[in-house]
UniProtKB/Swiss-Prot annotation:
Uppermost EC category: lyase
Pfam families in UniProt: D-Glu_cyclase
HAMAP family: Hydro_lyase
Family statement drawn from the similarity comment of this UniProt entry: Belongs to the D-glutamate cyclase family.
Enzyme Commission (EC) number: 4.2.1.-
Keyword tRNA processing: no
Protein name: Putative hydro-lyase RPC_1666
Domain of life of the organism encoding this protein: Bacteria
Native source organism of the sequence: Rhodopseudomonas palustris (strain BisB18)
């Protein structure tokens, strides 16, 4: 595993891997977060003005598979102590996306210049958490093997609407042999707060994916002849919904570049 360092922290007392990961992001020394800080929960990010926060919270409650909330800030507060005492939502991800009227207008490495006192941050569970459990059972995770971002796709599966928020579910994909796919269903069912069991196996066209080799987000990965694509609900769904709703202003993470928290993956297992 690559060791990440942040200027000013060399020689310090031993630091949690999750804290080291955030410091590296803060210093611009992390290019992606898949496989980073093993054992620690990573999260998707959606930041909205206070006047839209209640509707978005309701949207997440009505769509728990793609949008399981694991943390939420107070209005105007960039800290979420339940996820990490030193955590700063404005600086601690490798890259962000800034949205205006449904269009992405910037992709900065921090959002200090975009932060406002009326913003509320939502952190949504990420499938990277259950990947640790899959790998512990010796199931292959292709995007980690290839050193790329997980492929993600917009689907024809409609989310339940809430206020201005409505749109398609986004899914992440991992290719597996059929017998391994069955085992993956069993393993990931234990993690409902990070998307849980798959929403679809095989036949990508039946959920509106026209070309499996051209993901809408992330990077394509190899699918071997004896494998099938396995699809999980994905926390990038809010980005598709924010774009569809054309909200005046929002901030999200850049797909595949997550917030590393101090929560342990094992804390999220229900069995």
């Amino acid at each position: 595993m690559t060791v990440l360092t942040a200027p000013g922290f060399s020689g310090a007392a031993p630091t949690l891997p999750s804290v080291a990961a955030r410091l590296a992001c803060r210093a611009g020394n992390a290019e992606q977060t898949a496989g980073l800080a093993p054992g620690y929960v990573q999260g998707n990010l959606a930041i909205l003005p206070e006047n839209l926060a209640a509707s978005f919270h309701r949207f997440c409650q009505q769509n728990p598979k793609p949008c399981p909330i694991i943390g939420m800030s107070e209005v105007g507060d960039p800290k979420i102590p339940s996820l990490g005492l030193d955590l700063d939502i404005r600086t601690d991800l490798p890259r962000y996306r800034v949205w205006r009227d449904g269009e992405m207008v910037d992709e900065p490495t921090d959002i200090m210049a975009h932060w406002r006192e009326d913003l509320v941050a939502f952190v949504i569970g990420c499938s990277f958490s259950f990947e640790e459990a899959l790998m512990a059972d010796e199931l292959p995770i292709r995007h980690i093997e290839q050193g790329v971002r997980v492929p993600m796709y917009r689907t024809n599966i409609a989310c339940a609407p809430a206020g201005p928020f409505a749109g398609p579910m986004v899914v992440s994909m991992r290719p597996l042999k059929p017998k391994d796919a069955i085992r993956a269903v069993q393993i990931t069912s234990r993690f409902p707060s990070v998307h849980g069991a798959p929403v679809h196996l095989g036949l990508p066209q039946s959920i509106g994916i026209k070309d499996i080799a051209k993901p809408d987000y992330g990077d394509p990965v190899q699918i071997k002849d004896d494998e099938i694509p396995v699809f999980w609900a994905c926390g990038v769904t809010p980005q598709a919904v924010i774009a569809a709703a054309r909200v005046p202003f929002a901030i999200t993470h850049s797909p595949g570049l997550m917030l590393v928290t101090d929560l342990k993956n094992k804390q999220l297992a229900v069995l």
